[in-house]
UniProtKB/Swiss-Prot annotation:
This is ATP-dependent RNA helicase DBP6. The keyword ATP-binding applies. PROSITE patterns: DEAD_ATP_HELICASE, HELICASE_ATP_BIND_1, HELICASE_CTER. It catalyses: ATP + H2O = ADP + phosphate + H(+). Residues 60-69 have a biased composition (Basic and acidic residues).
Length: 607
């Protein structure tokens, strides 16, 4: 029916003749061309040109054949066209098969057998250690004490405050003797003898640059030794001479409770002078507090580190006139990283003070466990520091503190709360205010509930009330418990069970005993716990309940080895008769104790 088309891909030798051109009308030629596959539209330009010539020949031939009245093409010509298309298809298939077989053979030849490995760690690159950073850390630890003048003092260094009447102002001396004591404690004597004359002389020479002459002050003194009164006297002595209210002293403390405690001491010393003392109250909004401090700039500001950074960012006040920076409970402050307060504060000081670098502010750093923070002290950029130490040990216990260890056999460890109550009659004091330290918040709640049940069942020989300071209570509840504990009635025993929340800085007068129901984890923590009693030259007692040989060895190796005591101080152990009396339990007491345990179990399970 159709004539074979011209195949441009087919080559003809010389002498061969091309197949006759198909004789199709022009319209039919176009229809046939449109029916071709779209693949032919993407062929080379040479093929398109050849097809165009082919079409022209078809038009010429069709005209000639129309003149002869022929409307169809012979069957032989149609077979030739189909054969040409089929041959092209077969050549394409054969070439594709050849390419596929070559690829398969190549891939088979390149494939390597898989290697079997055992379960071994994957090889890692060698660790690149920053030796420069390690050397830098070592250098920082060494530089923390470089150019440090060590001043040793002992428990015999007491002196009446009247001996300083030629240096201290009349009003300040009257406030000290009337509100605190007539005799200076050892650390107060050491500071007043060494620092006060130097500070007064430097201030009289230059009111602007006297901080460089004095240098920084580091004090390692036991808790309850009068550190707060010591630095407050130095501040009021200098600031009472100023003429205009400007922020000249910042006292940093770690907790809100300490803010108010320090404020009471500083405000009592500033009575009768024009020194303005302010505190940052955490229960007021930051915006309201900022407006108040801007309206009346204080001379002394008592604040926590995080709140200080907030005010610096709000530009509540400037550090341009700052002369004193006091860190109370410095070891705890330096362990805190609220908003990177230390770096932020040092940066602001160097930027805002008239002269840059160390010495632009007198830094007073106080703690009972100061010597363990040498690396962090370097961040404070100390300038010619003077280090006040008592003894050669890390920590020193006050001479008025009596310590006792009560070994408890492991077989009697289940009755530890009962032994605690049996201990009370041996504590010969008219009014017992006992602070019991445990290891966790849950232990505080459980022990307080169990002791209350035991007192209710008659296992206590003295009238006793028990309270628990814990994080489950609201702040108001904890504050009321502390106030009730501090105001305990005469002839009554008050027990307050707490974690180490109460072991730092809190000054409650009249705590007669500290009982370490659970041993602290370090000598540092032990010093702070025992420091809640025997404060301000008053007597106090600490009792440690040691269960089994393990706790006794821990006490000896990790706590007692770091502590120095007065020669005529603690006995450390109960005598054998007292110990046997405490750990020997009657069947009646044991039965009552088990009954109390069942009551506690029912109350916990809610049955």
């Amino acid at each position: 029916m159709f004539a074979a088309r011209f195949d441009p891909s087919r080559h003809y030798e010389e002498g061969d003749t091309a197949p006759p051109a198909p004789s199709l009308p022009m319209k039919r030629s176009r229809d046939a061309q449109q029916d071709e596959s779209e693949s032919e539209m993407s062929s080379a330009e040479s093929e398109d040109e050849a097809m165009q010539l082919d079409d022209e020949e078809e038009v010429v031939d069709s005209k000639g054949k129309e003149n002869h009245g022929s409307d169809s093409i012979g069957t032989g010509e149609a077979d030739k066209r189909h054969q040409s298309v089929l041959s092209r298809f077969q050549r394409t298939i054969s070439v594709q098969d050849k390419l596929d077989s070559d690829a398969i053979v190549g891939s088979d030849s390149e494939e390597e057998p898989a290697k079997m490995h055992g379960l071994v760690p994957i090889a890692q690159p060698a660790i690149v250690r920053d030796t420069l950073a390690q050397d830098s850390r070592k250098e920082r630890k060494l530089l923390a004490w470089s150019n440090t003048t060590k001043i040793h003092y002992d428990s015999t260094m007491t002196k009446p405050f009247a001996a300083y009447k030629d240096i201290l102002s009349t009003s300040l001396l009257a406030n000290v003797e009337g509100g605190f004591s007539r005799t200076a404690f050892p650390i107060q004597t050491a500071l007043l003898d060494s620092v006060l004359p130097l500070m007064s002389q430097a201030y009289s020479v230059s009111k602007r640059y006297y901080t460089r002459k004095v240098g920084d002050i580091l004090v390692n003194a036991s808790t309850g030794s009068g550190k707060t009164l010591a630095y407050a006297m130095l501040l009021i002595h200098i600031l009472s001479r100023r003429t205009v209210n400007k922020l000249r002293a910042v006292i940093l403390v770690p907790t809100k409770l300490l803010v108010h405690q320090v404020y009471d001491t500083v405000q009592a010393l500033a009575k009768g002078s024009s020194v303005v003392v302010a505190v940052s109250k955490m229960d007021t909004s930051l915006k309201e507090e900022s407006a108040k401090l801007k309206a009346q700039e204080p001379d002394v500001l008592i604040i926590t580190p995080g709140r200080l950074v907030d005010h610096l960012n709000m530009q509540t006040f400037s550090l341009k006139n700052l002369k004193f920076l006091v860190l109370d409970e410095a070891d705890r402050l330096l362990n805190q990283s609220f908003q990177n307060w230390c770096i932020e504060l040092m940066t602001r000081l160097n930027a805002e003070r008239p002269f840059k670098g160390p010495g632009n502010v007198i830094k007073m750093i106080f703690s009972a466990t100061l010597t363990t923070n040498t690396e962090r002290l370097h961040d404070l950029q100390l300038h010619n520091p003077k280090l006040f130490l008592m003894g050669s040990q890390l920590y020193h216990m006050p001479a008025q503190l009596q310590e006792y260890n009560l070994p408890i056999p492991t077989s009697k460890s289940y009755a530890k709360p009962l032994i605690l109550l049996r201990l009370l009659p041996l504590l010969s004091t008219e009014s017992l205010r006992i602070l019991v330290f445990v290891k966790s918040n849950e232990a505080s709640i459980r022990l307080a509930a169990l002791l209350t049940a035991m007192v209710g069942n008659g296992l206590s020989a003295v009238s006793t009330t028990v309270g628990s300071i814990n994080n489950n209570n609201s702040k108001a509840t904890n504050r009321k418990l502390i106030e009730a504990f501090a105001a305990g009635a005469s002839g009554h025993c008050s027990i307050l069970v707490s974690t180490d929340l109460m072991s730092r800085g809190l000054d409650i007068s009249g705590i007669s005993h500290v009982i370490n129901y659970d041993l602290p984890i370090s000598s540092q923590q032990y010093v702070h716990r025992c420091g809640r009693t025997a404060r301000a030259n008053t007597s106090g007692t600490a009792v440690n309940l040691l269960v089994g040989k393990g706790e006794q060895n821990f006490w000896k190796d990790h706590i007692d080895s770091d502590i120095s005591r007065a020669p005529d101080g603690s006995h450390l152990f109960f005598d054998e008769e007292q110990r046997e009396q405490l750990v020997s339990l009657s069947e009646e007491d044991t039965a009552t104790y088990k009954k109390c345990l069942e009551e506690l179990k029912k109350s916990v399970l809610g049955r």
